[in-house]
Amino acid sequence: MRKETALKQAQPGFMKRFGFYIALAVLAVIVLLPTPEGLSVAGHRMIGVMVFSVIVWATTAISYPVSAGVIMVLIALLVGFAPNEATGRLYGTSAGLGMALKGFSSTAFCLVAAAMFLAAAMTKTGLDKRIALMILSKVGAKANRVLLGVILCGFILSFFVPSTTARVACLVPIVMGMIKAFGVPLKSRFAGMLMITVAQVDSVWNVGIKTAAAQNMVAVNFISQTLGVDISWLDWFVAAAPFAVLMSAALYKLMLHIMPPEIDEIAGGQATVTRLLKEMGKISADELKLLVISLCLLFFWTTEKVLHSIDTSTSTMVAITLLMLPKIGVMHWNETVNKINWGTVVLFGVGISLGSALLSTKAATWLANQIVSIFALESSTTLMVLAIMTVFLIVIHMGFASATGLASAIIPIIISVLQQLKTPGVNVVGMTMILQYVVSFGFILPVNAPQNMIAYGTDTFEVNDFVKSGIPLTLIAFALIMLLGATYWKWMGLV
């Protein structure tokens, strides 16, 4: 562990120590203020809960699972004791708790939970590691080709490992093993280039593939719930893949320019990867079974609405059931349950509940009206709206360590903002999907995403190295959003 990290843990910052109490104080102030005109009491209180959530998530003053529990209680009590304008009576804590638990009954929640099991199966069998090593064994020993291999690993794994942190957790030990086997210093530009790329390419392909990240499921759920449109895996891929491919190419060029490796070719590099692959032995029966089930699942994802009507969540649940069955499966409940990050699952469910409550109490609509008014968006062109909202999301993400939390708080408001626009021909579904891509832009700081922190923990680069890659990468991403918004996405009818 880094000395800096250990020091920070020993002496947490002011917001880390007092963020929870500040969040409670801000919540109390908001709730005690007079309810604004056009906003219900329940909506007023939900804005307070949302601000509380943003503060505790941004400061990580309390852990995400604990914050999820606190948010559930706040929704149950504050909404429960608010008057229901439709009936003239209080909502009641039972109805409030129902709002707090709504996210746990969504199909998106089932998909995220199932994805955790799929990621655990990949880790248990070692199939993800084998895939990564096979790719790296084919690219050669030149420094630039090793970098290309890391990018290809991130791309391929995003299809099969539907967990951001699981993909990075798979790649980091492999890349670290390669760095040590190559005899390259940990603080070399080559080592830093590879490890930063591991994190950044993961964020890039979070955009490209619907099932690659939990925050995508947040947006898909709200689009379905609010707008009645179900976005298939293929719909998402066709729209987002060009962006991710162009970003991957930009990442490759950028990393070679910013952190040019000290060596052109690694002596014995190819032999090292081959040795690591040989140490794994022949592909096991469990790996084969998982590979077949994963390929079948990928087939069902890509052909949804084309060859069949089975949605992504249902097909994933079927796959997980097969993986848990005797003889057919590759894992047992007792050994798998402890490998699942249940905190992430709970946070996701509560995030959906928070957004749903903002929508049902009309708090999101009221906030949207304020945003439209402040930024004069009502009659702006779609590209201007896209530019302003993209910059807004990039800036606000600087304070977040969880893209899932950011999506939960902001996507309902974005949908409401887009619904308020009077610009003719605005595609609310398409614009929401594109702005969800921006939610995954955790490129600038290590603390902006869990995958960044995993890579940072290897001690192969400094914060300023990450920032040097993150700022230009973010600017390129913004430029691509605007370019595709004016061309490809416009031709598709998304903008």
Give the ranges of each region predicted by the language model.
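Central hydrophobic cores of alpha-helical transmembrane segments in multi-pass inner-membrane proteins
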Residues: 27-30, 47-57, 72-81, 111-117, ...
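Helical membrane-embedded segments and adjacent short helical loop/helix-boundary regions
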Residues: 14-23, 41-46, 59-68, 98-116, ...
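Structural signature of hydrophobic alpha-helical transmembrane segments
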Residues: 39-48, 105-114, 167, 311-320, ...
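Juxtamembrane and boundary regions of transmembrane helices in multi-pass small-molecule transporters
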Residues: 2-34, 124-127, 164-167, 184-282, ...
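Membrane-embedded alpha-helical segments and adjacent helix-loop junctions characteristic
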Residues: 8, 35, 66, 70-185, ...
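Alpha-helical transmembrane segments of multi-pass membrane proteins
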Residues: 112, 144-158, 184-206, 231-236, ...
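Lipid-exposed faces of alpha-helical membrane segments in multi-pass integral membrane proteins
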Residues: 18, 22-29, 48-55, 70, ...
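Flexible hinge motifs at transmembrane-helix junctions and intramembrane kinks/re-entrant loops
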Residues: 36-44, 51-70, 253-257, 283-288, ...
